[in-house]
Amino acid sequence: MNVPIKLIGNGKAPVYKSAGASCLDCYARLDDTEVILPKERARIPLGFAMELPEGYEAVIRPRSGMTSAGVDTAIGTIDSDYRGEVCACLINNSTIRAIVKNGDRVCQMKIQRAEVITIVVTDELTDTERGSNGFGSTGR
């Protein structure tokens, strides 16, 4: 599947970094270094816009290298009708400031099908063994 990408400013196209990668790595597009203080968040432009086919979405995900350093990425959905610059929300959960420079790989992007469903309101749902037990009820 071909997905048209429009680069913005000094942006770089997302890339698969290995033959078995399921996600594309995305790069920060910054004019100046971004400093994210502990427990703060920052919106990082990724330097591209795209034209996803109808019926698909892009999901912005964390990179393990960033997460291991205490910098998480808020999960984000890019809909097929969005044409603006794709951005990532980085959250510094560490106790030291995080530095993001232009061209740093800051997140991953997964392109996947986005099924459209029809909501059917009902008074009853079928019973299951699990029922309404949640939040750790299935064990570790």
Question: For each of these PLM feature ranges, what is it?
Answer:
Residues 1-140:
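DUTPase catalytic domain/fold
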